[in-house]
């Protein structure tokens, strides 16, 4: 991760707020059992219900927490936060934040719309662009309206070059970024945003 950040920590500190999502485990489960149960209910909901935004994890006690990258005081703190946000024992070591085990935020919902701030009532809706990493049974581009939010989803035109589990092939990240940018550019050129 230090190579990926490439000395850009100071730029991140000055950038618009970047919220990183963690999952707090149910109080009645340890971290390893939480991952097993979390992955099971997530995959059941994803493959059987085919839900874009799963809800079962929250029902059984997982809760999401968002932390601003800009709140990290050092590059090491940011690296720890990124690793905590993708913690999935036994595939990775158990990680703790403020003394409590934390897991990959995707165990709650891998499209973290619950961390968005809706516009106040009567104001124009906040526009949000969601670049998905896998295809769902939806059109290439679609919109979901929620109170105070207008979410525009863009599905990938082809499988993304890097897996969410792949920390070893950081050279694929720029390819993935370019694909997302190209897919969004195509959506813009087709008038998806208005």
Label every PLM stretch briefly.
Residues 1-194:
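Patatin-like phospholipase
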């Amino acid at each position: 991760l230090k190579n990926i950040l490439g000395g850009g920590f100071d730029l991140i500190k000055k950038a618009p707020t970047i919220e990183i999502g963690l999952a707090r485990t149910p109080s009645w489960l340890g971290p390893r059992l939480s991952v097993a149960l979390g992955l099971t209910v997530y995959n059941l909901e994803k493959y059987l219900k085919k839900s874009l935004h799963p809800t079962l994890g929250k029902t059984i006690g997982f809760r999401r927490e968002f932390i601003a990258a800009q709140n990290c005081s050092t590059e090491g703190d940011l690296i720890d936060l990124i690793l905590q946000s993708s913690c999935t024992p036994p595939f990775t070591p158990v990680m703790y934040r403020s003394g409590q085990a934390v897991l990959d935020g995707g165990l709650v919902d891998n499209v973290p719309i619950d961390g968005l701030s809706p516009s106040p009532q009567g104001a124009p809706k906040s526009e949000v662009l969601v670049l998905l990493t896998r295809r769902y049974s939806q059109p290439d581009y679609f919109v979901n309206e929620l109170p105070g939010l207008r979410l525009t989803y863009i599905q990938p035109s082809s499988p993304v070059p890097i897996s969410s589990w792949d920390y070893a092939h950081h050279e694929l990240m720029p390819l993935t970024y370019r694909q997302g940018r190209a897919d969004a550019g195509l959506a813009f050129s087709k008038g998806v945003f208005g």
